[in-house]
Amino acid sequence: VYALVESDTEKEQGGLFVSNDGGDNWNRVSKDHRLISRAWYYIEVFADPVDENTVYVMGAAGLKSADGGKTWSNISGTHGDYHQLWINKADNQNMVIANDGGAAVTFNGGKVWSTQNNQPTAQFYRINVDNLFPYNIYAGQQDNTSVKIASRNTSGGNITDRQWSYSAGGESAFLGFDPNDPRYVMGGSYQGTIELLDTHTGEGVGVMIHPVQYQAMQPKNMKYRFNWNAPILYSKHEKGVYYHAGNHLFKTKDMGKSWEVISPDLTTHDTAKMGISGFPYTNEGAGGENYCTITYVMESDRENGVIYTGSDDGLVHVTRDGGKSWTNITPKELGEAVVNAIEVSPHDPATVYVAAHKYKLNDFTPFAYKSTDYGNTWTKIVTGIPYGACVRVIREDDTRKGLLYAGTETGLYISYNDGVSWINFQRNLPVTPITDLKVHKNNLIAATQGRSFWVLDELQPIRSFDASATGKLILLPMTEVNRVSGYSIFDSNGEEKAKYPNTTAANPATGAVLYYQLPDSVKSLTIEIKDQNGEVVRSFSNKPKSSNSNNSFRNEPVLTVKKGLNRFAWNLRRQGMPTIDNVYIEGSYAGRKIVPGTYTVTLKADGVEQSTSLIVKADPRINTSAAEFSAQDELLAKLEKDVTDIHVAVTRMRGLTKQIKEMVKLVEQDNSKSEVVTMSNNIVKKITAWEEKLIQPKSQSYDDVINFVNKLSANVIFVHGELNGNVPYVTAGQKARYAELHAEWLIYQKELDELLNKDIAELNARCKALSVANVILPE
């Protein structure tokens, strides 16, 4: 039997003990400090079920002893901070280890472990976002660096580790920066350390307010006390100003070179709770145990000088003059609690929300409050949130007043009546603690404690929900969209679930997403998109469009007509170009994207219409003009028309050829019709020769394009592909090449006209004279 014992660290009495007689007698076999140095956070011992002399200890390092605990070696190959180990009783070479980075499996006794990079198990703290495009999400990640990750990959379909980078500070960082120019990021870590990171150079400097090595110190002896997750924020009103909180609130105007104290101690300053952590045995002085500290700071974005603070010992304060004077506005019934988040309403400067919890006191009651008078009076708003769902954060929607989102210990809740009542809104979100929420650019971003970041990409269905309007026809308002590159599984309109690697996240949809609510039994449904001139740029229906010689509708998406909410994604492209059967052409048949502007989207359901506006903007990173978009659109339209005309003509002539051959089969045994047979065979040869100037019939597969010379339509599609990008960039070469190809097509059009007006006309005349059915050019 092995026992890992924490004891008085000053007397060196702890360590690993072993009993060989079932616990009657014990001997200490190791006093290695690594085994017991952080007993508050972890120390777990595991005996091998097969080999009595093999024992494992989980701590900052994973340790293994093969001699009954006398000597130790590190378990390598995975993350640090180990908490748990499972050993297969039937095969002790098979183990599963758990640490702050996830879990790993071994089948050879720990020589090799499986990767942990395929597990979305990050524990994130507080969220911040910038206003770049695509915007970035920032947060501190437990037992790792702070993180910055893009909300979209504009060069692919998934957000991968290439869109990720480290940011300022450490694992427990709040991150502050100018959201419009986030070059300089201020990030914290435990015990009040702060880094100012220049993201352009990658260089960081320390700007700690009072650079003292606080670790192992009693909080009551510290000059300033900082929470493990000490707040840092960039001012919404004063350019270049950052705030940082310990037990006081601090302000810097010179990038951290100097700090001004702008508040008294905003905690209870209860010195009885500022002694040695881990008492009475092991001093745990890492910083996570500091008490009487400020846990949250919120600067009002509606009023300059209005700042709220919350502390881990249950106090809420406000200043309305930039810190000159402070008022204790703590809700009377709150008591000792961690004030975890504060939200100022984006719609009313006097309305403020507070989220608090007491789970550290073994009380899992949800606590959330609302005030409409700057905190003078409070109303508790937790109806519908059950016991156990401790509230960590509340955010109000920045578009719909009174729509609230609550992140709790067990998931997400929403309220449509300003907190009077709440409903669970979990959907596919894992049941996991939500540590922070942020409403940004039509997205709801969630930081979780163990399941990484989650983003709800499209908030308009939630914002537009009206319980009294269920069963009615509604076309939901649309949000602004940007023309972007990349793609997404959410561009699909199918019911199937697209798969992507679990080491990545799916992009948000790359076009416009339309939501519409339908009553029962809608039979006919269409969506029509018009530009500012009233031209229809695209239309869709719930019924597949019929396809003739122009088969561009072959893969046209179809609108769903289910009762309730329906979703339809449009990629902002016009109708695609028709294809040619049994010919491989390297290139895309996709139509061009619409130019930035305002469009009208009209939904028609069984004769009833509703319309809304769609604003399409350029990628803000692209420095271009409306004239350049128009020039691109104009040339692409010409190229698309030529491809369409060529492929429709070829398809129709193929249909005509088929008729001629079928007619020949019927009359070729009749000598009196031999002239018709001869004329028909000659015409088929002419049509084939004409077609082979337009397409390459020998091109049947991908590699054929390097074996057989491209013909006219492939050359036009190539120019179209060169130009049909997100950036409007029309070159002289593209215009000249179009002119050459168009002139070539005009020649072949004349040949086609001659075939139809002379050869086919003469054939039909001879057929009529000989009582043979004539041939008809298909539609």
Predicted regions and their residues:
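Beta-propeller blade termini and top-face loops
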Residues: 1-500, 509-510, 543-545, 554
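Beta-strand-rich binding/interaction modules
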Residues: 195-197, 514-515, 521-540, 598-602
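Extracellular Ig-like/FN3 beta-sandwich strand-entry sites
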Residues: 565, 594-598
